[in-house]
């Protein structure tokens, strides 16, 4: 136990940081303003010609320190004695400053650790979020058991502050942070779930940092437990970042003290001969080739870790251990399972002939048609049964703009789901978008679909819904009909996918 505590303390030991003074630096809020999360955050209401003002921040911090009582009435959420005018407006101002300042030491530490480990050299091969699927295809076919885990949340904000104090040594800064969270949260503590959800909407940047930090802390302890429980060395442990912001950080942060501080720590996995761990955002998958009782041991590790260290309630029945051949899991908008392909091989030895049955495991990654139809129905492209409908909101646009919008959505979905082993569901989605586009154009011209197509001859350019993928492939591969036909049937993982599609929702 003493060795474990020494390990964690050594891992968290960092030099003294002086972050408190940065809260009062004007360029910190200039960075937040230029980040364009919300252009109206740091705007004076009158007299400053739409320029952000450091005077607002200093005035609010002074009022926070002068506040005598921190408990504010729950019935006074829009206007109270502490904030004075608008809670959301002032909360966003200070939380943006906190989020930018607190990211600085973590990213500088990350930059040095990546350079020491020389991870940057081979990072380019793993910069897409879809790079996880070749890993699944390569490794999961040899495994037997899988556990689909949702990382429990929310966690109390005070616990996050206490954990942050282990990593960053700056007492005045965390005193101010605790004071801010206590004052902000005091008028909605009667409904805890509403408190966290409201905080995440009003302060998305700061909330994402706290959430990602919580997940990183949990995974660092998880890796430590794995090392203590196994005599085998950890074969690999890598942390990947969504490419959309990574290179901007590498090129500008160290030189310019940061142009962009987004903390998109989202994709991690580690593997060893016994256990495989994959995580994207708040969902992780644990798979193993060994007996299920070893998986059960890890399940109880997780439960006790969340309950005892983070005070997040989680029950064992929420984590199920299933045979991989009988269970499908959802990740990044795909349904994945292991399919058993059985074949009979005739073997002849001298005068004897034997029939040998061979079972080959193959991972099956398909498009989840029902969730996609629900997403399209929510976006008003079809009804809940998948029947295409018109989009009258776009009827004021020109014909070219309407067609271009539908084509972009169709191309993005086709690009995202090109790795599916079954294309029938994808063709149905493209058909829904194609017919919805035609109905929208017919609605704009106050005509029926049949009359509109007959009058305008729109069949030709609407065929792009089914031909744009072949045109892209023809630019990459030789213009051989058999080659393109084979590629259109096979799985293709495009490693330029930076983030999940807007119509993709992981449940």
From Swiss-Prot:
Cellular localisation: Plastid, Chloroplast
Annotated gene: matK
Coiled-coil blocks: none
Protein purpose: Usually encoded in the trnK tRNA gene intron. Probably assists in splicing its own and other chloroplast group II introns.
GO molecular function: RNA binding
Keywords (A to Z) from UniProt: Chloroplast, mRNA processing, Plastid, RNA-binding, tRNA processing
Top-rank taxon, per record: Eukaryota
Annotated protein name in UniProt: Maturase K
Protein's GO biological process: mRNA processing; RNA splicing; tRNA processing
Cellular component aspect of the GO annotation: chloroplast
Principal localisation: plastid
Alphabetical list of Pfam families matching this protein: Intron_maturas2 (PF01348), MatK_N (PF01824)
Organism: Lens culinaris
InterPro entries registered for this protein in UniProt: Domain_X, Maturase_MatK, Maturase_MatK_N
